[in-house]
């Protein structure tokens, strides 16, 4: 099934697919998602506050407000800062399956568990109903199903790839982030599922580093 995001029906990119999963698959998918919930707080970086138990998304919102307030009122020193807001368009539809598999391997999941998850997301197919009759058999090669209980969890795991790239750049002093005082930790980015807020020094070098990070993540994730 498809729904429209707006009243403008002329553009195809505004059409969202809604998958109709059978009951047995939804039970399996929900069970796997519940098993994930117990370990997500231990494997997902703390800058991701959405869809994680014992974390509130309002915490990241308050941190963003405080940092932007600091930037707007900063009048000491020569360094300026920049804030970039990223919105991943059709994020669920474009993720490469091999990428989620590699990320789960890096996070230490067993091969048996990874194979179970991959079977859930790869053994699917679609049909097109024309004049009331189902036609064709479309087999996707990327993306997560909209409405699948497992999809949000898998997307959080995929975003860890982006966080890992940013933290590696921060360790190499290529992407320094922002700190409001000497005793505070430096903040490089905050995540709200597929919406990201990045903080970095207003310099050509760090802007190039950010572009490099996003290009590498795009190439890997699709």
Regions found by a protein language model. Name each.
Residues 1-222:
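Nucleotidyl polymerases of mobile genetic elements and RNA viruses
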